[in-house]
Every structure is written in structure tokens, then in C-alpha cells.
Amino acid sequence: MPPKKPEPKKETAKVAAAPAPAPAPAPEPLRDSAFDPKSVKIDFSADQIEEFKEAFSLFDRTPTGEMKITYGQCGDVLRALGQNPTNAEVLRVLGKPKPEEMNSKTLDFEMFLPILQHISRNKEQGTYEDFVEGLRVFDKESNGTVMGAELRHVLATLGEKMSEAEVEQLLTGQEDANGCINYEAFVKHVMSG
């Protein structure tokens, strides 16, 4: 009788019993560089600063007019001064506060001015071509139009969400009889103010 071959189960058991090599350490996630208001050089003129201060004061809800706004008002003040930061940008320059801090934490004008300077320097405005290309994705028939209902849904639910009233204001008079919107004409309309 020939000698028995070793059973593969034993070899498998030996392989399984061998210590597994240590997993490679996970790469450290990239961290957002924190916004440092002290590092921002203010380039505004004295007249501009006075104008900004006046607008800022309109948002001040403190009982004694302390020239303070809540974190939640910061984006509104920036937009009132002609900037268009995303909500994410506003949260980043505020140090990513918790949602419950947005209406309790405040900042004064001296803290706000570097934020305004930073946001005004770092505008990333899309071009006409960028917006047309973005809307072309929704042009299923490649005829230069998008469905108004679909555009309404996208504007109200994706990215920087708009309210239904804002969407209606934006799209008033843009749809044809079939409920379609010529997106090149729409982008020209939006970019003209």
C-alpha cells in the first residue's frame, strides 16, 4: 500500500495559523486648512469699510447695538455686500461651528471684516460656458432645452438648495408652451443680473 499523502486540511490549517502581515497604516486624511483671520491683509478703502459697517449694523440684533451678528447671519451679510459664498465656504471661515452654535455664537465687525476680505478675494465665479455645460447634462434630446420641472427639482434639492419661491422667481417667463427652457438663453438671463 502506498504511503498516505498529507491531508491538505492540515496544510491549510498551518497556513491559516501563520500570523497575517500587519496591515499598512491608513493614510492620514487631508485636513482643511483652517481660516486664520489674523493672516488676512485688509485692502478695503476707508469709505468701503464705512459702507460695510453700515450694512453690518443693519443685521445687528443686540439690544444695545453692540455691532454683533450671529454666525447664522454671516452668510446673509456677505451676500448683502455683493458676495456669493456657498454655505460650505461660510461654515469653513467660521471654523465649522456646530448647527446649534449658528444662532448662539456671535462675531463683531472686526472679526467679520477679514472674513469679507477673504471671501471677496477667493471668488470662484463660473463662466457662461461652465453653466451651459452643467445644464447640457439635463438636455436628453440634445435640442438646447431642459424640462422646466426637472430644473425646478434640481434647483430645489441639489447643491446650494433654493426655496420654491426663489426657483419660481428665477424661472418666471423662461418656459415655452411645452414646459421646456432654452438653457443658453436662461444662462444669459441669469448672468445679466
UniProtKB/Swiss-Prot annotation:
The superkingdom listed in its UniProt entry is: Eukaryota
The family database entries (InterPro entries) matched by this protein are listed as: CALM/Myosin/TropC-like (IPR050230), EF-hand-dom_pair (IPR011992), EF_hand_dom (IPR002048)
What is the role of this chain? Regulatory light chain of myosin. Does not bind calcium.
* GO CC, alphabetical: A band; myosin II complex
Please identify the protein, giving its name as recorded.
Myosin light chain 4
Subunit: Myosin is a hexamer of 2 heavy chains and 4 light chains.
Q: Among its keywords, does the record have Repeat?
A: yes
CDD domains xrefs: EFh (cd00051)
Membrane-spanning segments: none
